[in-house]
Amino acid sequence: MATFIRFTAPLFCFFFLFSLFSHQTMSQPQHMATFCDDRLSDNFTQTSSYKANRETLLSSLRDRSSLGTYSNATIGLSPDTVYGMFLCRGDLTKTSCSDCVKTATLEITKNNNCTSRKTALIFYEECMVRYSNVSFFTLVELDGPYVAKYSLATFPTSLFSSFQQTLSNKVEQLIILIASKSSLSASTPYYVKDISRVNELEGSYTLDTVVQCSPDLDPANCGVCLRLVVKGLSGCCTNARFAQFYLSKCFLKYDTTGLPTSQSPSGSSSINVMKGEHNICPRL
């Protein structure tokens, strides 16, 4: 016999509001960093055509964010042209992507350092949004902003040296694979996830790797960008068990499971975030 539960109006409202609040809390995009060009020559006034074009561009990106994980737009005539784009993580639902882009396009203009800047870039774990008065489409910036998020738990010493080569080899494999997903007609362009079992004499573990490039890059530049990320990881978090590294045109995330437990100085579950105006890769 079926069992039915009758909700009174107040109780139903409580559960409805609780579920709504929980959904909003869980889906809240996680901000990582905001970068703005601090050159005085790249300022604009609040009554300028550039400001109006920027608002139109950000609104356009918000509107397009429900259609896919990437879009770019160009608004206005020179010298007030604004170029912009968004890129969502490839495993997000359309709703989560749209939520992140909407949040990012609103927050980027609220940042005190970005209010009057012609160039800005905002990173969330789920997406990134940027705009500029100079076109950046199809380009890999070798010295642009970066964000790294990584665990303070480290690899056992016996596996440390071999892991870097394992990760580098894995990324090279995925660079070849990702080229086949470069078309904008693909369900998720330039996004590949791989789960592999790594067997070493010193121990075995599972390596979960995700790579993604902005679809405006060609396959060759996508590879350049991802190789820069690997070098960037070696400059910040070379022996971390988990890491995410973001450049303006590509992203890499890896996680390892099945290794013996080790403690970092702050605890094995501690996470650190490193960011900078200039990519650490070229200095390696």
Swiss-Prot record:
GO terms for cellular component: extracellular region. Residues 1-27 form the signal peptide. Its main location: secreted. Residues 32-136, 151-259 form the Gnk2-homologous domain. InterPro entries: GNK2 (IPR002902), GNK2_sf (IPR038408). It is found in: Secreted. The keyword Signal applies. Pfam families: Stress-antifung. The keyword Signal applies. Keywords: Repeat, Secreted, Signal. Belongs to the cysteine-rich repeat secretory protein family. This is Cysteine-rich repeat secretory protein 8. It comes from Arabidopsis thaliana (Mouse-ear cress).
